[in-house]
Amino acid sequence: MTKSNETERMEESEETHSSDIRSASESDHASGSDHTESADEIPTADAEQGELEQLEKLKDDLARERAAFHNFRMARAKQAEIERDRTRSEVIRVILPVLDDFARIEKHSTLDDPFKAVITKLRSAMEKIGLTAFGNPGDPFNPELHEALFQNPSPDVQTETVQDVIEAGYCLGETVIRAAKVVVQVPNG
């Protein structure tokens, strides 16, 4: 071989070697960038996971706050209803003596038509707000509804029975505002 051929081969070999080195370097560089991207993706994935967890926590906190607010509103509405009933009860207790006076007047004397109309309107108004009278002669005696002022022994009854009503009792809805004051017949013996 001639020197020039030998030189050409060496140059080709160097070029091939340089080319191989460049290719390997580019390949390593590309692989390195893949490793870099993977390394970048991992923190990004962790960050996204953290953000998702924080978002879920915030959603949970919001749901809890909404539930707490709903419970507060319900409790407040219930408290307002209790206060309304208490206020109505107080107003009704003030009016009850007037109703009692009208009942006594009706029982012991005759009323003119205008007075009967006033009594009827007053009772109708009380019924509209939920006030009902109770306590009639012949009703079974109930200590939760009746206040016994007198007891009369009687052979005609088997159980304690209301004989006469001194003052009617009143309920506002299910709540007893005032027990009926009654005379009770009790069985002999």
Swiss-Prot record:
It comes from the Bacteria. Homodimer. Keywords: Chaperone, Cytoplasm, Stress response. Participates actively in the response to hyperosmotic and heat shock by preventing the aggregation of stress-denatured proteins, in association with DnaK and GrpE. It is the nucleotide exchange factor for DnaK and may function as a thermosensor. Unfolded proteins bind initially to DnaJ; upon interaction with the DnaJ-bound protein, DnaK hydrolyzes its bound ATP, resulting in the formation of a stable complex. GrpE releases ADP from DnaK; ATP binding to DnaK triggers the release of the substrate protein, thus completing the reaction cycle. GO terms for molecular function: adenyl-nucleotide exchange factor activity; protein homodimerization activity; protein-folding chaperone binding; unfolded protein binding. Coiled coil: none annotated. It is found in: Cytoplasm. Residues 1-38 have a biased composition (Basic and acidic residues). One of its GO terms (biological process) is protein folding. The keyword Chaperone applies. SUPFAM superfamilies: Coiled-coil domain of nucleotide exchange factor GrpE (SSF58014), Head domain of nucleotide exchange factor GrpE (SSF51064). Belongs to the GrpE family. This is Protein GrpE. Residues 1-54 are annotated as: Disordered. GO terms for cellular component: cytoplasm. Pfam families: GrpE. The lineage of its organism: Bacteria, Bacillati, Actinomycetota, Actinomycetes, Micrococcales. The keyword Cytoplasm applies. PANTHER family: GRPE PROTEIN, GRPE PROTEIN HOMOLOG, MITOCHONDRIAL.
